[in-house]
Amino acid sequence: MQLALICENPERQNELDELAQRWGLSHDENSIFALVLTDTQLELRKLDEAKLGAVFVDLVSGAAAHRRKFGGGRGQAIAKAVGLKKGVMPRVLDGTAGLGRDAFVLASLGCTVQMVERHPVVAALLDDGLARAKQDPEIGGWITERLSLLHASSQDALVKLLEDPDFIAPDVVYLDPMYPHKKKSALVKKEMRVFQTLVGADNDADSLFAPAMALATKRVVVKRPDYAEFLANAKPSTAIETKKNRFDVYVKAAMT
């Protein structure tokens, strides 16, 4: 993929070069997107809409820290959806990791989560945020133990993992496909505006459902906007609703 590659600290230029090679990125000075390596982090900027600010992964402070400390623990809708309860810590595969927020919440509650992200820029941002979080004295220990990242197409990853005899199948496959926002919602979060331009909607999301159901041993959970149809038109066993979203739960077996 091509976009502007910018290093703000000359001493880190080698890091940016290695990063570009690892994720298959090449420099395009005319791109409206820039992947910028600052003194502290990797971030994405939309150059023609500077007011949107930078998009980066921060699992240590800000919103992530607030949700970890005050987000409601196991009472959160996502925790209920994956079947998290006393004595039950599901192994989760997050097939559409994005910026890792939902995976981080589940890991902070005790789940082991393997994240899958197919877009190279998003995967690079997530990998950078994960690396920084692992260095944090407060959360680094359990981040290292519980969170991992696989860069691959979600569908390919699900199928390949299903065929791998050494892979321990997850209890839960969690999917949160990018869904087109309603045109009238002008105040879409800056990240979503940047992402929808860069990544686009997951138009092939329906194709994730069958391999997800085959891979999960206990359940599949699909996060949807409240106005969205069911993934692959499959009616869930149950649904947990929040103010703006819905967690469709497809139960295969009881959580034990």
UniProtKB/Swiss-Prot annotation:
Family as reported in the entry's similarity comment: Belongs to the methyltransferase superfamily. RsmJ family.
Where on the tree of life does the source sit, at the highest rank?
Bacteria
Give me the gene this protein comes from.
Answer: rsmJ
Please explain the role this protein plays, according to its UniProt record: Specifically methylates the guanosine in position 1516 of 16S rRNA.
Upper lineage is: Bacteria, Pseudomonadati, Pseudomonadota, Gammaproteobacteria, Vibrionales
Among SUPFAM superfamilies, the record links this protein to: S-adenosyl-L-methionine-dependent methyltransferases (SSF53335)
The record's listing under PANTHER family reads: RIBOSOMAL RNA SMALL SUBUNIT METHYLTRANSFERASE J
Reactions catalysed, semicolon-separated, are: guanosine(1516) in 16S rRNA + S-adenosyl-L-methionine = N(2)-methylguanosine(1516) in 16S rRNA + S-adenosyl-L-homocysteine + H(+)
Task: Spell out the protein name for this chain.
Answer: Ribosomal RNA small subunit methyltransferase J
